[in-house]
Structure formats: structure tokens, C-alpha cells
């Protein structure tokens, strides 16, 4: 929702699918793009100055990304555990928004924030041509690790990115206890 700073107007709200869940924050760019990741889609919602829009003609979009199984602890749901992070500003050619996906062994996924370059071809293994690229995260874990998952936003500097793995080998079965134990 967007709320008038003087609290004189009714909040402007966008509702997603009844089967979707949003458990993270949103990011906002300098052109009124609002980036929200549900457990199924990464979205750009646009504030037009008078309303929130999910219409492509206003620059809005949605893209599927990879999901997985319910992890043993820390993260709720099967989608992303990260608030979208913006990457690329000013005169930088590539304006991206990045998240970690919900795959059991997560990927870092970069989506084109604005228009997809005309010569861009969808990367093999991605769910949409909105995905500029995605990379598997190993976090130094052995190849047979069942889980590599994060509940934090991706940290970026320029076009570099840093993520953490919040799943350990011996997790408590109780998610609350696991969150307390791991911080």
C-alpha cells in the first residue's frame, strides 16, 4: 500500500493472488518502481502519481522464479527469503533487482528492472526472460547438501553480491527454536 504523507487520502493498495504470500519488505527505485517478491512471483508495481499500477503499459511486470520445498527452519514458505535489492544506478547500463529464490539449493536471481534489452535471449534454466541471469549458491557446502537457503536480503556493491546460508546440518524441528538458535 501507498499512504498519503498527510494522511488525507485513502491508502492505495494492490492485492496479489489469494494463493500468494509476501513475507519480506519492498524496495523502491528513483522512478516510482516498487519491487515486491511473493512466494511465487517477483513483481514491479508502479506508482503513477495517483495510483498503484500492475499494468505493463505503466512499466509494471511480474516474473516467476524457482521455488522449492518447505525448509526445515528459518524461512517460512517455499519462495524467496529475501527482500528485493536494487543493483545498477545512474548511468549504469544494467538496472537489476536481485533476490535469492526458493530452490532447496538457492540461486541468486537478477531480474531486469526496466525494459528487457532487445537482443537479450532467455538464459537456459530460468523461468522467464525477465531474469537477466541466475547463479547457484554453494556457500562452501558439500555438493550433497540438501539445503542452502537465506532469510536475508542480498548485499550488493556495484554489480557484486553477497549472500549467506542460514541452514545448518542439525536444525531443530521447531522453526521458532531454529530462528532463535541461529539469530
Question: Can you describe what each PLM-predicted range is?
Answer:
Residues 1-23, 27-183:
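Extracytoplasmic/lumenal domain signature
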